Design a protein with these regions (language model features):
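Long, contiguous interaction/recruitment modules in multidomain scaffold/adaptor proteins
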Residues: 1-112
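Extended amphipathic alpha-helical coiled-coil/heptad-repeat regions
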Residues: 99-265
């Protein structure tokens, strides 16, 4: 099936806001596209009465509303809930829906923490850093090492550190990495932690911290040189040259969009 779909029903006057991606949708086609492309984000924050009411009131699809509401009352699986939405406009071929349903089943049979991590990792990949951090935090608040094993939570902390670092919150990133290292003594995690210290601490305090940790001089020098190299590289990046060709108004607007997307605001 192609990537373009003819708009078959009316456009909503009032959009439906999808919190996980901070976006408004106006048509059932847009809803279908979201469901198909973001299966890791489909949960009760989307599959609820509010969505059903929007489909009835804004799109005028009363029969579909009734069908979906019945699915909610029976507490059907996510796969069973979204099937009528796709069928309403024939958005997917039979094989496409079968493949999608298989993916959803594989997600649904996973423990809650793994499903949450899949969602958080997806948000991290698509630069929704604040929402990713929120999901990682929920996992850590309710953690039960007996269920998932300590390595799972070390991985959660590592990924959470990545989200913080993307927001330039290097102290928070360092804290996550130190917690992760306390769970699993990974050399890579330790090096990432030291990198964050070089970035977020004043030089004198960083030297003190390295002495406390008994970091070998050779490793300290290597890390400091690497961070300096990255800093210089960033300043001299090709992007700086590209930006010089773009009007300042466009640069500011682009940076605004990137910021709002990453903070989900």
């Amino acid at each position: 099936m192609g990537n373009y779909y003819l708009c078959q029903v009316k456009k909503a006057k009032n959009p439906y806001y999808i919190e996980s991606i901070s976006a408004n949708i106006y048509t059932i086609e847009e809803l279908c596209y979201y469901l198909k492309e973001n299966i890791y984000l489909i949960d009760k924050t989307l599959i609820n009465e509010k969505l059903c009411d929007w489909i009835r009131d804004e799109l005028g699809l009363k029969k579909l509303y009734k069908r979906l509401y019945e699915q909610l009352e029976r507490e059907e699986s996510i796969g069973n809930f979204i099937l009528p939405i796709f069928k309403e406009i024939g958005y997917l071929s039979h094989q496409e829906f079968k493949n999608l349903q298989e993916k959803i089943v594989q997600i649904e049979i996973q423990p809650d923490d793994i499903r949450r991590k899949l969602k958080a990792d997806y948000l991290l990949e698509y630069k929704m850093y604040i929402n990713a951090i929120s999901e990682y935090s929920k996992i850590l608040q309710e953690r039960n090492p007996g269920n998932m094993g300590i390595q799972f939570y070390a991985s959660v902390l590592n990924n959470m550190a990545s989200a913080y670092a993307q927001l330039f919150l290097f102290e928070e990133a360092a804290d996550c990495l130190w917690q992760s290292y306390g769970i699993v003594k990974s050399k890579e995690t330790y090096k990432r932690y030291l990198n964050c210290l070089v970035i977020c601490l004043p030089p004198a305090r960083c030297d003190e911290k390295f002495k406390e940790l008994k970091v070998p001089d050779e490793l300290r020098q290597k890390i400091q040189a690497r961070v300096k190299e990255i800093s210089i590289s960033a300043k001299e990046s090709a992007r700086a040259g590209e930006l010089s060709e773009i009007p300042m108004e466009e640069i500011v607007e682009s940076l605004k969009k990137e910021y709002h997307k990453s903070t989900c605001s």
